């Protein structure tokens, strides 16, 4: 029996493709390495809308900790559904936020705010988001920076190519909100 359930976008039938799927898999793999078998609920699975309520009831019956990593609509549904189930099962509910959109969604959904206040913890990627959620009255928020397992290169292994024009490489979606304009301006000034 698993101690922990992770409910998120696994894409169990294929290789994870987007940031949400990658983070869900990285988190689950890390938890599994430390705590053993994890019960996975794949929000992308075929028939997931039908199966997921039953899977989550099973998770509430058998797991002590339930971690969710939903997108926008999934959060609205899952937060309220799990909070309702938790009145019966009294489990530790956790929400690992992916991206920076949560503080924009919550003011439009006071019912989700109410549900998330009942979660044991909410893990956000930045201090800015933590501050925004604290302004909404949350005290169960902590910062867990985004991560990805990478091999550490030894000194001398990294190729040194410092020739103009300098190249810009990013590890995120290219959007103005993420500061790509500032980064591009700096590289253009250097070149």
Task: Label every PLM stretch briefly.
Residues 30, 43-89, 108-110:
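An amphipathic, basic-hydrophobic alpha-helix
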Residues 118-127, 142:
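A short beta-strand/loop micro-motif in the catalytic core of glycosyltransferases
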Residues 12, 16, 149, 173-176, ...:
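Nucleotide-sugar-dependent glycosyltransferase donor-binding/catalytic pocket residues
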Residues 128, 147:
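Carbohydrate-associated surface elements
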Residues 71-75, 91-108, 121:
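A short, histidine- and acid-enriched strand-loop-helix "catalytic/donor-clamping" loop
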Residues 5, 160-178, 184-191:
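Conserved donor-binding/catalytic core segment of Leloir-type glycosyltransferases
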Residues 1-44, 89-90:
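N-terminal subdomain of nucleotide-sugar transferases
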Residues 65-67, 121, 167:
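Structural motif
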């Amino acid at each position: 029996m698993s101690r922990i359930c992770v409910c998120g976008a696994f894409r169990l039938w294929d290789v994870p493709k987007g940031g949400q799927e990658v983070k869900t898999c990285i988190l689950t793999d890390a938890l599994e390495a430390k705590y053993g078998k994890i019960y996975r609920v794949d929000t992308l699975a075929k028939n997931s809308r039908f199966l997921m309520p039953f899977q989550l009831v099973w998770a509430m019956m058998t797991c002590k900790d339930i971690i969710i990593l939903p997108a926008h609509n999934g959060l609205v549904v899952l937060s309220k559904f799990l909070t309702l189930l938790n009145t019966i099962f009294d489990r530790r509910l956790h929400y690992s936020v992916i991206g920076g959109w949560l503080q924009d969604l919550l003011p439009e959904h006071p019912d989700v705010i109410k549900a998330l206040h009942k979660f044991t913890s909410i893990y956000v990627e930045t201090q800015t988001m933590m501050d925004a959620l604290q302004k909404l009255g949350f005290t169960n928020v902590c910062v867990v920076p985004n991560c990805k397992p990478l091999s550490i290169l030894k000194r001398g292994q990294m190729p040194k190519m410092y020739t103009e024009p300098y190249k810009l490489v990013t590890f995120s979606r290219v959007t103005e909100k993420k500061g790509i304009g500032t980064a591009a301006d700096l590289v253009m000034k250097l070149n």
